[in-house]
Curated annotation (Swiss-Prot):
Keyword annotations of the record: Cell membrane, Decarboxylase, Lipid biosynthesis, Lipid metabolism, Lyase, Membrane, Phospholipid biosynthesis, Phospholipid metabolism, Pyruvate, Zymogen
Xref: PANTHER family: ARCHAETIDYLSERINE DECARBOXYLASE PROENZYME-RELATED (PTHR35809:SF1)
EC code: 4.1.1.65
Assembly with partners or alone: Heterodimer of a large membrane-associated beta subunit and a small pyruvoyl-containing alpha subunit.
Essential cofactor(s): pyruvate
Name used for this protein in its record: Phosphatidylserine decarboxylase proenzyme
Main location: membrane
Homology family: Belongs to the phosphatidylserine decarboxylase family. PSD-A subfamily.
Coiled coil feature spans: none
Membrane topology: Peripheral membrane protein
Record NCBIfam families: PRK05305.1-1, PRK05305.1-2, PRK05305.1-3, PRK05305.2-5
Post-translational modification: Is synthesized initially as an inactive proenzyme. Formation of the active enzyme involves a self-maturation process in which the active site pyruvoyl group is generated from an internal serine residue via an autocatalytic post-translational modification. Two non-identical subunits are generated from the proenzyme in this reaction, and the pyruvate is formed at the N-terminus of the alpha chain, which is derived from the carboxyl end of the proenzyme.
UniProt KW S-adenosyl-L-methionine keyword: no
Length: 232
């Protein structure tokens, strides 16, 4: 393997949503160097951080019917049974919910937790309070998606936070997704909620680190059947 290919294998590409930001930071950095070199070095650090924030690494997703994988990198902040927001259309009974908080240092590309078809997408304007607070799921700006699978419906909500002010979705209603497929992105810190079918037992705990497309949140079929893996 050449040195160039080796470097490419170690450094993930930048997501296209990050191009304007990284380019803008780089331009400002050049201006800062022209004004005063110490400012330019500060700009260089910020440009590198921006490129790091918008990284788009490949992930190896376990592929088996019934597995629910994490839609986001971050920390599992809540595992509770709670009534889902009405826009999901999942009823008024409490359902298992796994919440994953993404800091500004996590990769913010979001991935489908299951293989299924997008039944519903609803954008809800709102506030920008701390995404770690429980009420953020109802008060904050959010983009809600319902995935239909053979084992029931899965609700996925992208929630904006104090710093995150832009939710990006790459998908549309009726579109099929495979587990681990990229479906969106949230800029600069936020939260992802996953609502599981009634009676599902989450396989993660609060405080655990989750990796998008890889960490298994739940098994809708149960058991320990074999699985294959897909890298994307």
């Amino acid at each position: 393997m050449s040195i160039v290919n080796s470097v490419r294998a170690q450094i993930p590409p930048i997501h296209r949503e990050g191009y304007p930001f990284v380019g803008g930071f780089a331009l400002v950095t050049l201006i800062l160097f022209w004004i005063w070199s110490p400012l330019g070095w500060i700009g260089t650090v910020l440009t590198i951080w921006c490129a790091y924030f918008f990284r788009n690494p490949a992930r190896t997703t376990p592929v088996r019917d019934g597995l629910v994988v994490s839609p986001a990198d971050g920390r599992v902040s809540m595992v509770v049974d709670i009534i889902p927001p009405p826009e999901l259309g999942l009823g008024a009974k409490p359902l298992p919910r796994v919440s994953i908080f993404m800091s500004v240092f996590n990769c913010h590309v979001n991935r489908s937790p299951v293989a299924g078809r997008i039944e519903r997408i609803v954008y809800s304007p709102g506030k920008f309070i701390n995404a770690e607070l429980d009420k953020a799921s109802e008060d904050n700006e959010r983009n809600s998606m319902v995935l239909s699978t053979e084992h029931g419906q899965i609700g996925v909500i992208q929630i904006a936070g104090l710093i995150a002010r832009r939710i990006v979705s790459f998908v549309r209603e009726g579109q099929p997704l495979v587990a681990g497929e990229r479906f969106g992105l949230i800029r600069f810190g936020s939260r992802l909620d996953v609502y599981l079918p009634e009676g599902t037992k989450p396989l993660v705990a609060e405080g655990q680190t989750a990796i998008a497309g890889e960490t298994i949140l739940a098994d809708l079929k149960g058991g320990d059947a074999g699985r294959t893996y897909r890298t994307d």
